Amino acid sequence: MFGYIRPSKPHLSEQDEARFQSVYCGLCHELGRKYGFAARFVLNFDFTFLAILLSDAQEPECESCRCAAHPCKAQCVMAHTVALETAADHSLVLAWWQLRDHIEDHGFFKAIPYRLAALLLRGAYRKARTFVPEFDASVQRHLNDLHQREREHCASLDQAAEPFAALMADIADCVDDEMRRRVIDAADDFEKDAHSNCYNPLRYRYELDGDKLDEQSREAVATSLDLSVHRMASAYALLSCGVWTSILDSIFYESLYGIGNAVLKGTYH
């Protein structure tokens, strides 16, 4: 579900790469500061992107910190901000419900790793939901909606993507709705879902029986993804992002296209 929204680092300047890394590390430290060490493991690029999108347009204040991942060399870490705290709160709640979703989707033995992870995060989740109770309720509601569509074997990509898109909409109302529609997750999980006999909207949309997308289906998904990214980029163009502009340009105009193509070709890692 997570990890697709990241900049194309080879095309970033050293300054922008360091700036992005400072936010990534800042979110990690914010998760640890507020929710404990185990919470750091829910860190992902998607909520780093959210923290950037919600940050002030000016150069962020940074601190020099060491951590378990970088014990020898201090890193430049974005100092505590409302944007980081918002990203941390929402990412913790969403990660918890993603674990619960995995537990429901897998058999007893295959779900053991997810049960253990949920046990470690239970206290952090209970704390996080007190800060964002409306979002916590929203996640439950939209995931129930998603499960209902899974049980119905919904063949519409738009309808299958809608619950998670609506969930993302509840995180940041300032972000245009087109920035939240994602089909790429279904394409990335297609083979895994086929082997485990889990619901995947692409399977029903294109009436596929195997564990691979055929060429015609792949082209149709690519067209849908390109259209979605184009509309997201159009919405993004209306924002004023200051020092974050180069990083966000890289995401909207390069990275999302590249990652989508890599997923469809089976070369994404």
Label each PLM-derived region with a short phrase:
Residues I247-N261:
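Membrane-proximal bilayer-interacting regions
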